[in-house]
């Protein structure tokens, strides 16, 4: 059996840092687990740390905010290995405490919505049969977090991925022009951002299957790790999140690994948002 190739996009901290050890233990010493950081030096440092911990890791630089990064990294994996078995997109632009939506909306949507679609488009062509392509998102991305009149804009049974991102661009324009509240968008930018991220993943998964672009047995899903205490969420504990509900990064990573390691021949879940093995219905 060929050695498994996995990549974790965004692996320096929190859940991303906890994932390599879990995947390494499951995939064995012959596997290659790529971990990314924003700079080459940080990626190599991370890979060295993981290697000392017994993880078969290699480092690559990757920044989700760089439009060229997904295609560049996918090209490297194609050249070195011919394909990839597991892709976990864990990187994201996180809301910043004390920063207004007008400042955060454009970079957040550019990264989380458009960046997610670039990852999906770049890595699907090199995904091996029975491969797993996972976008780490959140239950904040469920339609229940939007008012009813906005939900039809995210009809992932019909809309193309680019159409979803056009909706997100219109949201950014509304925020910057000061009309977002009147249009009914939530005050906190993370809700629309995550809805867009989950919706574009669902729309892309539907397209991939309908277009015959999906490798045999491959699965594309979004994943909700659940509330997790990390550097990115610490400022929101006690306000947005309940500290008593928070997991450790290691606990959250187990749920993501479970989705990534579903055995060959598994047909579902597909095109869903999954939290610790349970499908969270997008429209509920």
Residue ranges and their predicted role:
Residues 9, 84-94, 132-138, 221-222:
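Rossmann-fold scaffold of SDR-type NAD(P)-dependent oxidoreductases
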Residues 12-13:
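Conserved glycine-rich cofactor-binding loop
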Residues 27-45:
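Conserved glycine-rich Rossmann-like NAD(P)H-binding loop of the short-chain dehydrogenase/reductase
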Residues 50-68:
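Rossmann-fold cofactor-recognition segment
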Residues 97-110:
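Short alpha-helical oligomerization interface
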Residues 100-101, 132-215:
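Catalytic loop of short-chain dehydrogenase/reductase
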Residues 118, 222, 230, 238-284:
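C-terminal helical subdomain
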């Amino acid at each position: 059996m060929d050695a498994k190739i996995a990549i974790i996009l965004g692996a320096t901290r929190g859940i991303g840092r906890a994932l390599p050890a879990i995947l390494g233990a499951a995939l064995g010493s012959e596997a290659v687990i790529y971990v990314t950081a924003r700079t080459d030096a940080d990626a190599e440092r991370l890979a060295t740390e993981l290697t000392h911990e017994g993880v078969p890791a290699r480092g690559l630089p990757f920044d989700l905010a760089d439009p060229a990064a997904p295609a560049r990294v996918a090209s490297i994996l194609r050249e070195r290995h011919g394909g990839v078995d597991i892709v976990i997109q864990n990187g994201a632009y996180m809301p910043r405490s004390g920063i207004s939506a007008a400042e955060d909306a454009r970079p957040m949507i550019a990264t989380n919505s458009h960046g997610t679609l670039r990852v999906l488009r770049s890595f699907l062509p090199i995904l091996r049969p029975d491969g797993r392509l996972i976008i780490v998102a959140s239950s904040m991305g469920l339609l229940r977090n939007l008012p009813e009149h906005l939900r039809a804009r995210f009809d992932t049974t019909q809309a193309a991925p680019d159409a979803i991102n056009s909706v997100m661009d219109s949201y950014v324009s509304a925020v910057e022009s000061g009309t977002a509240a009147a249009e009914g968008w939530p005050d906190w930018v993370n809700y629309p951002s995550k809805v867009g991220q989950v919706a574009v993943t669902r729309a892309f998964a539907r397209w991939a299957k309908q277009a015959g672009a999906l490798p045999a047995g491959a699965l594309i899903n979004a994943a909700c790790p659940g509330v997790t205490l990390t550097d990115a969420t610490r400022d929101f504990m006690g306000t947005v999140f309940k500290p008593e509900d928070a997991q450790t990064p290691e606990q959250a990573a187990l749920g993501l690994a479970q989705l990534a390691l579903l055995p060959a021949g598994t047909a579902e879940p597909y095109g869903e948002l999954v939290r610790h093995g349970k499908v969270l219905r997008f429209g509920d």
